[in-house]
Amino acid sequence: SALDPEMVGEVLELMKDLAKEGMTMVVVTHEMGFAREVASRVLFIDDGQIKEEAAPAEFFEHPKDPRLQEFLSKIL
């Protein structure tokens, strides 16, 4: 859900700490920097369908799906 902008950093830091401790999380986010840093797998969902799934390095450096390429070009 949307967070108070003043709380986003604090919540993301807590989630990073939990991930470092080995907690498994399923996170839906537009915070791509966070996903790149914390995730072991990243999925791109478009129109209710999984369009791409990869390790963060592959996902961000070599996206295959045209919609994902477009999305990343606009936000990174």
Q: Which residues are covered by each model-predicted region?
A:
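Short acidic-hydrophobic catalytic motif
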Residues: 57-61
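ABC ATPase "signature
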Residues: 53-54
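A short, surface-exposed alpha-helical micro-motif characterized by mixed small hydrophobic
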Residues: 35-37
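Helix N-cap at the start of a conserved alpha-helix in ABC-type nucleotide-binding domains
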Residues: 5-7
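H-loop/switch region of ABC-family ATPase nucleotide-binding domains
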Residues: 29-30
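ABC ATPase nucleotide-binding domain "signature" loop
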Residues: 1-3
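Helical segment within the ABC ATPase nucleotide-binding domain
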Residues: 9-21
